[in-house]
Amino acid sequence: MHSLLTQNNNINIIPIKAFKDNYIWLIQEKLNGIIVDPGDAKPVLTKLEKETINLKAILITHKHHDHIGGIEELINNYPNVKIYGPENNQFGFKYQIVKEGDAITVSGTKVKFNIIETPGHTLDHIVYVDKEHLFCGDTLFACGCGKLFEGTHDEMYKSLLKISSLAPNTKVYCGHEYTKENIKFALSIDADNYELNERCRRLQDVEITIPSLLQEELETNPFLRVRNSEEFKLIRKRKDEF
């Protein structure tokens, strides 16, 4: 079972639940905090105030409202917060555009991330990765992947290949709690997969299933187990109709 708090090298990673199934991620280093994809400001403000955490930065993976809807209110409460995100003219606030190959260091912390562009779910989608953690928004889910609202199947397949090449012990922090439904679909097309069946059994009574390890995604996630773009397209369409 994964705990509600992931501790590593004096950095805590804490899930903040929002809406029906969203995860907003708080990366805490001492009394400094970084928020990933704050779709709703209220639970974030409650957590920051309760723990007396100073919000240093906001990381945006993509433009959907359930990932950015709380940003303006957070700016009102923390006017000096630094915001990073993909290039998008629709954002109504100032932020630093980051692209593939960029690296960011959050001021006042030791937190550093590299940027990878992952078009598919949306064309502007990016992910943030360091040696041990991946914040992937709606590109990769536990045992699943994001729906294609803008990108092509080939674009999404190539985006997932980028993620697949990361270290197997990378912890994967996605934007939604879809794991159990995703496992049901995975079992419908890969019923004899021992690791997948074990994952299903292990998570039956677990409420928060994130983070997962990239290694277990490589073993059980049908969208990372395909051999080419055409296979990905076929399975993605089957999932859309599941």
Describe the residue ranges of each PLM region.
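Glycine/proline-rich, flexible active-site/cofactor-binding loop segments
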Residues: 62, 90-93
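Short loop/edge segments at beta-strand edges and connector loops
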Residues: 85-87, 99-100
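Catalytic core of the metallo-beta-lactamase
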Residues: 1-56, 95-185
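Glycine-/small-residue-rich active-site loops that bind phosphorylated ligands and cofactors
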Residues: 66, 90, 148
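Active-site metal-binding motif and surrounding structural segment of the metallo-beta-lactamase
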Residues: 41-85
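Accessory terminal helices/loops
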Residues: 2, 161-171, 178-242
